[in-house]
Amino acid sequence: FPQLLLHTLRIFLFEKNRDDIERINEKELLETFDKHLLGLESINEDFVIQFIETLFDVRYGFDRYVIKWITVSEDKEEHGIKDIYKQNQKKGGWTYYLRRLNKDSLHGMALLQSILYHSQQNTTQYWLTPFLYWMIEEKPSFNDAFEWLRHLDNTVFSSKTVIHFITYL
């Protein structure tokens, strides 16, 4: 959760045209928030509400599009993406709840994210910030998200522009 908060803070600061955080470091979570968010003179109730709304959007995008460890059996876990969908049921009245469904069609995106996850420091995952920001803005289908992530990997992480891109988003 601290990483999710730090990625949310990066997105929020970017949207507000404020300076980015120096690095993603869970151990410096409180200091980072003090420096980049809580220490601002312009902080007010609306500002806080906007941050919470950004956090909600980031969390939804994270839950929907980003790999997690999934228990396959008692002694085996693997990376996977489970789609979220609303299901209703009538038992003496309507009940609505969210379910997660493991889809084979998401396997390619899960593999690509797994490569990105393991090829970078697992404490930073800088690819997540631009990916989450893009998902919030575009609200893509899974196919579009997969194509954009492939583009991110091929264009940014396979070239010299990675430092520039990560620095400014």
Role assignments for model-derived ranges:
Residues F1-L169:
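Flexible coil/loop and intrinsically disordered segments
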